[in-house]
C-alpha cells in the first residue's frame, strides 16, 4: 500500500514530459529513505505566476525550473541566493515556511562537467548559442574560470546584454552577436568549444541544428546542454566530423544532486542518480 508522501517536489517547465529528473530524484529519495515524491509540472509561460504561487497552499517543498522559465520565475519568488542573483536565473526553488527562495545549480553542474572532461576554460575560446537561463549560468562559469566567450542569439540585444554583464565582471572576456550564418562562421573559426544552450534539437525541434555541418571540424569540442535525445542533430553532425561530443546528462545530474542537497541537507547519492537518469533516458528513447 502506498503511503502519503511527507513532502512534494517537482520540475516546472514547458515542455517537461521529456524530463528524467523525476526518475533520478525519486531514486535519490528512496536511497536516502526519505518519504518524498517528485513530479513533473507542465506550465505555459502565461500560467507560471499561478503555479509558483500554488507552492504555498499546496505545501510543495521545492521545485526545479527548466526551459523557458529560469529568468521569468525570479519575478514570483521572495528572495534569491547570492549566486542566483549574480547569474540572473533560477533553476531551484525552496519553500521555507511559505517564503520562496531561488537558487542556481546550473553553474556548479557545468563546472563539474568541465572538470570531469578535463577542460580548463582559460585555455579555450567558447562559442555559446543562446542567451536564456542556462546560458546565463554557463557564461558566468566560463568567464569565472578565465575562458573567452562569444554569445550568439537570434535576438542580438539579448546576446549583447548577456555579454555586457560578463564584461562588467571580467574586463572584455565576452562579446555578443546575432546568431546568423555569417557570425557563426566567423566565430567558430576562432573558437575551439561550442556550447548549445538553446532548445533546438529537442522536443518538437528534434532533428534540427543551428550549425551547418560544413562549419564543424575535428579539433572542436561540442557540448549540448540537451540530454534528451542523448545525441542531438548537432552532436551527430559533430561526431561525423571527428569532433569530441558531450551531451547534457552529466550536467543535469550534477545540478540535480546539488538541488537535492539544498532541499534535504543530505549528501546526494550521485551514482544512484546518474544510473537512474541513464535508465530513464534509455527508456524514453525506445
Swiss-Prot record:
Pfam families, per the entry: SDH_C, Shikimate_dh_N
Enzyme Commission (EC) number: 1.1.1.25
Keywords: Amino-acid biosynthesis, Aromatic amino acid biosynthesis, NADP, Oxidoreductase
GO MF entry, a single one: shikimate 3-dehydrogenase (NADP+) activity
Binding site for shikimate: 19-21, 66, 91, 106, 227
PANTHER family: BIFUNCTIONAL 3-DEHYDROQUINATE DEHYDRATASE_SHIKIMATE DEHYDROGENASE, CHLOROPLASTIC, SHIKIMATE DEHYDROGENASE
Protein name: Shikimate dehydrogenase (NADP(+))
Quaternary structure and partners: Homodimer.
Source taxonomy: Bacteria, Bacillati, Chloroflexota, Dehalococcoidia, Dehalococcoidales
GO BP terms: amino acid biosynthetic process; aromatic amino acid family biosynthetic process; chorismate biosynthetic process; shikimate metabolic process
Active site residues according to the UniProt entry: 70 (proton acceptor)
Broad enzyme group: oxidoreductase
